[in-house]
Amino acid sequence: MASKEPQHRPETIAITAGRPEVGADSALNQPISLNSTFVAGGAIGYGRYGNETWTALEDAIAALEGGKTLSYSSGMAAISAVFSTLPVGAKVVASDQGYSGVMTLLGNLSAAKKVSVNFVAIADTDAVLAALEGADLLWIESPTNPSLDVAELPTLIKHAKARNILVAVDNTFATALLQKPLEMGADIVMNSVTKYLAGHSDVVLGSLSTNDPIQFKALEDARKFNGSIPGPLEAWLALRGIRTFPLRFQRASENAMELAKRLSQHPLVTRVRYPGLPTDSQHLKAKAFMKGFGAIVSFEYAGSAAAADKVCESSKVVTYATSLGGVESLWERRRRWPIESASVPETLIRLSVGCEDVEDLWIDIEAALLAGK
């Protein structure tokens, strides 16, 4: 009886997946395919339909998420592809707190009467289940951006699928290292590859993973005919980033836990949001099915919005910038953006914790907190 291939762990998958076939003098790394045109008779056909470098990146993400994967020119391009497959008038259930780009897009689609949207508190399981009646799509972001609310994924997915509702999960904050929604029964998993997967703040990419061949074809057509294709150089950079993704994410998560503990004791911080803290309202839910708590810490500053801005402007190690998931620590007051949800507190600062020495980070953060007074 032939032995089965070993089931590798994520740390091994990140390093081994998406490599060229092994042979004498074969390249260890996938080359960058700078081609718009391909000789007839092959599987690609044209540069908008496929690219060997995309395929390598998609193979790596697929191995991590456990589903066939498509890469897109950005996370928003991937998200838009999902919504573009819905029929006119489709009912969408989504979180009332989450990535502002998604909430804005859904608001625009609703205003144009292309979909109807029911925004609910995604951490309130009963409220979500009540909203599922007649829904076509349940869009879940968990943990949410920037409030770090946690959805009970196993329960929500189970009930939605029992009603034949399409379920899509934004897995950007948790990543496949902490939760695998496809294994729970979700139809689609979205990643902003820009963030932890690529991890170096130098590319903008997105991905969708699914085990449903019909969904895959629809999403592939959306990419093909909307032109939301990734560049081969960006795909190559993201693939290189994936090689160190588990190492980076582990270090950043360890730093985040330590900083969350210290921030929760600081007199200039009124509230810390981090599911890893036993005192956090989301802790028990996260602990029940997640394998960790991630590398984002959100906290509210004890002062005005202007004072919170001054905190972010005063740091030397932590960079005052939008985005997250890179090796460097970033922070910002989220309500400085007009499109951010009004339910997010004015003084909430989202801290994307990087891989620096945690003591250097704390010295910098503490000095910045004092500078905001």
Language model: regions and residue ranges:
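Short, solvent-exposed beta-strand edge segments and adjacent coil->beta transition regions
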Residues: 203-205, 292-296, 346-350
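N-terminal glycine-rich, Lys/His-bearing helix-loop that initiates the first secondary-structure elements
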Residues: 1-45
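PLP-dependent enzyme catalytic core of the Aspartate aminotransferase-like
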Residues: 107, 248, 313, 329-373
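Conserved N-terminal alpha-helix of the aminotransferase class I/II PLP-enzyme fold
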Residues: 30-85, 101-110
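Short hydrophobic/aromatic beta-strand micro-patches
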Residues: 209, 298-300, 352-354
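Conserved PLP-enzyme active-site core in the AAT-like
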Residues: 2-7, 16, 20, 69-268
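A common structural junction motif
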Residues: 226-227, 314-325, 368-373
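Structural motif of enzymes handling amino- and sulfur-group chemistry
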Residues: 28, 34, 223-310
